[in-house]
Amino acid sequence: MMEQYYEIKKQYPDAFLFYRVGDFYELFEEDAVKGAQILELTLTHRSNKTKNPIPMAGVPHMAVDTYVNTLVEKGYKVALCEQLEDPKKAKGMVKRGIIQLVTPGTMMSEGPNDAKDSNYLTSVVTTEKGFGVAYSDLSTGEVYATHLKSFEAVSNELLSLRTREVVYNGPLTEQNKEFMHKANITVSSPTPIEGEHAEISYVGQNLTNSAEKKATEQLVGYLLSTQKRSLAHLQVAKSYEVNQYLQMSHTVQNNLELVASAKTGKKMGSLFWVLDKTHTAMGGRLLKQWLARPLLNVDEINHREEMVQALFDGYFTRENAIDALKGVYDLERLTGRIAFGNVNARELLQLSRSLEAVPTILDALDQSDSDVLKEFAQKIDPLKGVAELITTTIVKDPPLLTTEGGLIREGVDKQLDRYRDAMNNGKKWLAQMEADERQKTGIENLKVGYNKVFGYYIQVSNGNKNKVPLDRYTRKQTLTNAERYITPELKEHENLILEAQTRSTDLEYDLFVRLREEVKKYIPALQKLGSQLAALDVFCGFASVAEQNNYCRPSFHTDNQDIDVVNGRHPVVEKVMTAGSYIPNSVEMDSSTNIYLITGPNMSGKSTYMRQMALIAIMAQVGSFVPADSADLPIFDQIFTRIGAADDLISGQSTFMVEMSEANDALQYATKRSLVLFDEIGRGTATYDGMALAGAIVKYLHDKVGAKAFFATHYHELTDLDETLDHLKNIHVGATEENGKLIFLHKILPGPADQSYGIHVAQLAGLPKSVLREATKLLKRLEAQGSEIAPASQQLDLFAQPEVNDSEEVQAEQAVITDTEQNILDDISNLYLADKTPLQIMQLVADWQKDLKDDK
């Protein structure tokens, strides 16, 4: 057996080999040692009596999926080696072979948290002109292809797709290997495929670009070689260009938190969290795809908005459709499992129940007053025949396994009914036969019996042998005092009774497979229906969100890049705040203004204001309504951001290098139709270097790029740029002081901020009083120095001993007042001495002293 194991293992050296032995899958050698550690299995040994016992660990075959998923989730591959013949019938060694190679990009099972996530396997081929890229989610059969000019563009696509595995046809540079490793992407080599396969030609039939075609052939070839079965559900590849959509790099999508919070990596806190009111897994996946690829075509956007508008206006239509959608399972992945051959009876019933919900959805749409909803409904095929086929074949509550019987309804197959009748009524039939034969023959002591050697028989005593009807009875066994006989009828029922269970189970499985193969004929229609219901689910969700959050339908213009958003709101921030407490802000940028230079204190809302604009643009071009009183927008072709201060762990770049790289992307690739968000450019380096770079970048954006840009800064010297840059406008986020406390107004106001309130924000953060006092002194000195930018040799040494007069130092120390100090000052101011005795005043002073000591 071990020779067979080693021979198979040789073919899959980079995978865990799960080797079927009876009711277990066994791991041997290094696989066992490593697998036992990862899967928390008991490590044993085979051939313990030898000098070199073989490490071994096993898992029950019934639970193998759980263990396989654990390994694959960690980035490993698993080769499933199955027994290919019945061990009882095998002559010699049981024949075994690999039935499937499970890899990170081909895993089809899912947990409760990833039903709305796609699992993409991506194929990349190098060509003379660049790269061909094709990717697929095996569980749904969708296939997409494109071509890119640089590996940087490929890397961005891989990150945006959240690809788990890449099939790459060439050697990777060390830098690219490092990228794949840090991005947690498994890299696999292409696998040669022998002979012609219909799937390869079918999937790539509409591709005209040679790079895309090669990438798709490599993709499908890898899937066929690893899955080792027909993949009839793979769809015709859809070719696309990245510039067909609003382009956003992976970094931009992360900065704007489109599908996950930047802090937690979870759904909560993202735009997806706000917009996801879908009730199907496929609707959730489609929404994520739309958020990553907003549209550029105004007609397509308007069509989506018309659907949302109709569902927004038609409350009962929407609610009836939603109620029906709640009963729809994941048609796309159910279809994939049907094609894959691992669907069970319960899942087929899920399919039929999903199809049974479609007529209700169609009725809701047909009864609406909206032509666009009626047109949408007319394109949907409810596939009634498929649902009926399943429900008339499968029992209402079938078992999970398809090999143990109990799947098929009565009346579906006459032979199966006879088997079941034999199983359920065998003893009753034998008793009845015994009574009938006694009556027919007149032999009162005739009996029907059974033994394991001869099976069922009719026993007649020697005294009654002359009454036996030999034309019907055949002698089977002679005893001392009796004879045993068999009849054709008894023999027939003997076979039914003894083999009914086995034959019934086998026949049920055969009937189930026939049903599955019949349903498989409808795969293209089921996939189309799934995509239609997914889109409807998203539209209903958009309408619900718009109603709940008081969104408006945006309008678009293509003759200029003017922005007019009245009382816009950040969709995520608004949701986590108390209802009605969010302070809205407008954006009015006509042809006279291309750049908003935004100043104001930290925490005042500068970043929120900028992100708000980007999210409104994305929501609008996805087809959603937007959080504003009104919005008239241009079509943006790209969004660039420089937000946040963090090192790029994947590329190994420092904070400042990341900052400059992201700024460079905008300066190099932004067009007049782009939206640019820059937050605190230059803070990753020395003050004057940063200020100089920030000023130069603003000027370049103004003079060379011409995009609509939001530029937040603490370099107040930059606000003077409005004197020389005609299309730059200063705005600031309002703040005020009350009783020494900083109050954020969160309102966008014209002109630059008069100060940044940095020390006040530090006070809110709880910095020690001594630090705040020292900062106040230093601020006084810097303000005394003046705002002119001096060369490095003349820049102020912050830590040199200054010449500060006593009055300035006192003013500096008094500038920072804690809450405790303010309360004491208020008590003194309100104290009426005539009402207090000397002892009471002494007690008050003692209390104040104690409070001041506790406050230090």
UniProtKB/Swiss-Prot annotation:
Residue sites binding ATP per the record: 600-607
SUPFAM superfamilies per the UniProt record, alphabetical: DNA repair protein MutS, domain I, DNA repair protein MutS, domain II, DNA repair protein MutS, domain III, P-loop containing nucleoside triphosphate hydrolases
Q: Which GO terms describe its biological process?
A: mismatch repair
Single annotated GO MF: damaged DNA binding
Q: Which Pfam families match?
A: MutS_I, MutS_II, MutS_III, MutS_IV, MutS_V
Its Gene Ontology cellular component terms are: cytosol
* CDD domains membership: ABC_MutS1 (cd03284)
Task: Decide whether keyword Nucleotide-binding is in the record.
Answer: yes
- Per the record, the domain of life is Bacteria
Write out the entry's keywords from A to Z. Answer: ATP-binding, DNA damage, DNA repair, DNA-binding, Nucleotide-binding
Q: Does the keyword Repressor apply?
A: no
The record's listing under PROSITE patterns reads:
DNA_MISMATCH_REPAIR_2
Q: Which HAMAP family match?
A: MutS (MF_00096)
**UniProt function note:** This protein is involved in the repair of mismatches in DNA. It is possible that it carries out the mismatch recognition step. This protein has a weak ATPase activity.
User: Would you identify the family this protein belongs to, as annotated?
Assistant: Belongs to the DNA mismatch repair MutS family.
Q: Which PANTHER family does the record associate with it?
A: DNA MISMATCH REPAIR PROTEIN MSH1, MITOCHONDRIAL (PTHR11361:SF34), DNA MISMATCH REPAIR PROTEIN MUTS FAMILY MEMBER (PTHR11361)
The protein's name: DNA mismatch repair protein MutS
Record organism: Lactobacillus acidophilus (strain ATCC 700396 / NCK56 / N2 / NCFM)
Protein encoded by which gene: mutS
